[in-house]
Every structure is written in structure tokens, then in C-alpha cells.
Amino acid sequence: MTDRLRPIPPEDWTDAQRAAAQDIINGPRGALYGPFVPLLRSPELMGYAQKLGEYLRYRSAIGVRLSELAILVTAREWDQQVEWAIHAPIAQQVGVPPDVIDAIARRERPAALLVDEAVVYD
């Protein structure tokens, strides 16, 4: 698959792009990938998107376990294989049971959901 917007080579980054990229690399993501590659064309917007995404994924009130469960349910619903491949192992690491992950992968409602997981799933 070809990128519609080719990545900007690091040697061509402006000072603002370099600073925005470094903020993401130094943050919890640890690397510049996914939507941040084309967003680098607008470093100010990229900064706002990064802050929103960081909050939703890492610091929201529902916690990391339920956040990862929501990501898996959404990834499966919309056939987002890359998101699934990235987040299924993370979900297991943060406490989503393997049988829950497997059921979602099969597009089935997991049989043994905790109350808070059922709220997210349903």
C-alpha cells in the first residue's frame, strides 16, 4: 500500500516539526508512527491530537484495562487489523482475559465479562 502523503524525511523537518516529533517520541508512545506521520505536516495540530490521544489512551477515568477493551471492540467492529494486532497483546498485558479477547476476535460477546467490561462491550 502506498502512502497518500509520503513521510517527510527527518532532514527536511522544520524546527516546529522536529519539536513536535520529539514530543511524541519522548512521550508514552515512544515513536512517531500511524496518524502522526501525516499530521507532522501541521505540527500544531499534531500536538493537540497527541495530547488528546494520550489522555484518552493513558489517563482517562476508565483506566487502561477498559480503554484497551474499548479499542479491541472498536477495532473488530470496523475490521481494523493493524489496531487489533497492536492492541490485543497490550489488552492482555493490562488484564483483559485471553478468553474475552478471543471471543471478541470471533465477533462473539464474551461469556464471562466483569460488570465494567460489559458496560464497555455493550
What are these regions (language model features)?
Residues Q22, G30, L56, V73, ...:
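General N-terminal targeting signals
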Residues V37, I71-L72:
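Generic alpha-helical structural context detector
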Residues L52, L72-V73, H87, I104-R107:
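Short acidic/histidine-centered micro-motifs embedded in hydrophobic/aromatic stretches
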